[in-house]
Design a protein with these regions (language model features):
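Extracytoplasmic Ser/Thr/Pro-rich, glycosylation-prone low-complexity segments
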Residues: 1-191
């Protein structure tokens, strides 16, 4: 599979005002919404014309292990797959069954050149308001390249799974071990 590009320049793609908000039923089990792509996205020898956006900070296809809300190390057949993990943690965006601690929204915008999924100031599930916010986005290109941009990340940064894996959970890249911080404000990586 691809490797991470070193010395990546931070490049936020602003979709505010043009993105469509996703409306999740809840923030845990099966909390994904499907987004159609106007192009085929190649990923591990398959091509997809959609992405499933999960409220817990990852995107994927085919919904294998979609109900997993607790992150862990990859590659692993017990984790969601195939998937790209931008910041997979137990996140708590606004949803139809929101608790008082839910905050932030998830938007997407697609065109022929790229697809963007934006986690806009989403909080981590803690049961407490004010636990920090995560402002990051996925960008997918028709070539199969993908990147994650992190605009402003506040709160717990060392508990997320970040990387990608194939549909069997047998191949993938974990960019950081859970327990270590990897992302920071105005940071990007691409594969």
């Amino acid at each position: 599979t691809s490797s991470v590009e070193p010395d990546m320049n931070y490049e936020w793609i602003d979709i505010e005002g043009q993105g469509t908000m996703l409306n999740f039923e809840n923030n845990d089990s099966f909390s994904s919404e499907s987004v159609s792509l106007p192009f085929e996205f190649p990923f591990f020898n398959e091509s997809y014309t959609y992405i499933n956006v999960n409220a817990n900070g990852w995107i994927g296809w085919e919904s294998e292990n979609e109900s997993v809300w607790q992150n862990g190390s990859i590659p692993s057949s017990s984790m969601p797959r195939p998937a790209i993990f931008g910041f997979f943690d137990d996140l708590n965006p606004e949803n139809q069954n929101s608790t008082a601690s839910a905050s932030g929204n998830i938007f997407y915008h697609v065109n022929d050149d790229r697809a963007v999924v934006w986690f806009d100031d989403v909080v981590r599930w803690t049961g407490e308001a004010g636990s920090g916010t995560y402002d990051f986005q996925f960008v997918l290109y028709p070539s199969g390249r993908f990147r994650c941009n992190y605009r402003e990340m506040e709160g717990t940064l060392d508990q997320a799974t970040i990387g990608w894996q194939n549909d069997a959970g047998s191949q993938g890249t974990e960019l950081v071990d859970v327990g270590e911080a990897f992302v920071f404000n105005e940071f990007s990586w691409e594969a």
